[in-house]
Design a protein with these regions (language model features):
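Local sequence-structure signature of Cys/Sec-based thiol-disulfide redox active-site neighborhoods
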Residues: 2-28
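C-terminal cap of thioredoxin/glutaredoxin-like
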Residues: 25-31, 101, 105-205
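A short alpha-helix capping/helix-coil boundary motif
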Residues: 6, 54-55, 89-93, 120-122, ...
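Conserved short-loop catalytic and cofactor-binding motifs
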Residues: 14, 63, 99, 126-129
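Short beta->alpha junction loops/turns
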Residues: 15, 83, 131-134
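Structural alpha/beta surface segment adjacent to cysteine/selenocysteine redox centers
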Residues: 20-111, 184-188, 192, 196-205
Length: 205
């Protein structure tokens, strides 16, 4: 397992605390494993999942900055134009702003503050933030995830062989041994398709 290289797609939404826990854990694993774990972060807006009307399409909304989900995706997409490391830093910063700071990721000043904190070129970021280029990416990620892979929530981790799992990592008590946990997670999810669902009972609920 230690010598394996894995590439995974991770479906996420910034509003989801479980996706935040997954991001922190996977970053810890990547920090130790380096190129042996490659992660493609895929947009999966929960606002679209929970839409009341069948006609609602998040990616068809106007590019006017009024939707927080789209705005957060525009922000991280703008960061990615400044490099993979810039994306990585901004991705983590947006989760922190949302879940530790309680900030609204639809507010331009919040996004610009995050961009400044992670060292982005602010003028370039401001220009790229206004692009609607990411809208089609959101559509493609969501549609493929839902229709082709059966993704229903975040975070969902999908391996190259198409096997995947929706995983709730306790963001208040992350694994103390992130790589060991990863090495235990992989063979069950990737290599055991007969394991259809694992769900812990919740005493008192």
């Amino acid at each position: 397992m230690a010598d394996e290289t894995n590439t995974i797609d991770v479906y996420f939404d910034y509003t989801c605390p479980w996706a935040w826990g997954g991001q922190v854990w996977l970053y810890q694993v990547q920090d130790e494993l380096g190129d042996k774990l490659r992660v493609n972060w895929r947009f999966f807006p929960l606002e679209q999942v929970n839409a009341k009307g069948a006609d609602f399409k998040l990616w068809e909304l106007p590019n006017d900055g009024s939707n927080a989900s789209l705005r957060s995706y525009q922000a991280v997409h703008a960061a990615k134009k400044q490099g993979d490391d810039a994306f990585r830093r901004m991705h983590a910063a947006l989760f922190l702003k949302r879940h530790e700071g309680g900030r609204n990721l639809g507010q331009k000043q919040v996004l610009e503050a995050a961009a400044t904190e992670v060292g982005l070129d602010l003028d370039t970021f401001r220009k790229d933030l206004e692009s609607d280029e990411v809208f089609s990416v959101v559509k493609d990620d969501f549609t493929h995830g839902k229709k082709e892979l059966g993704v229903f929530g975040t975070p969902t981790i999908v391996f190259e062989n198409g096997q995947g799992a929706y995983l709730k990592v306790n963001f208040r008590d992350l694994p103390k041994d992130p790589v060991k946990f990863w090495n235990e997670f992989v063979p069950v999810v990737r290599d055991r398709p007969e394991a259809i669902e694992i769900k812990r009972p919740q005493p008192g609920r």
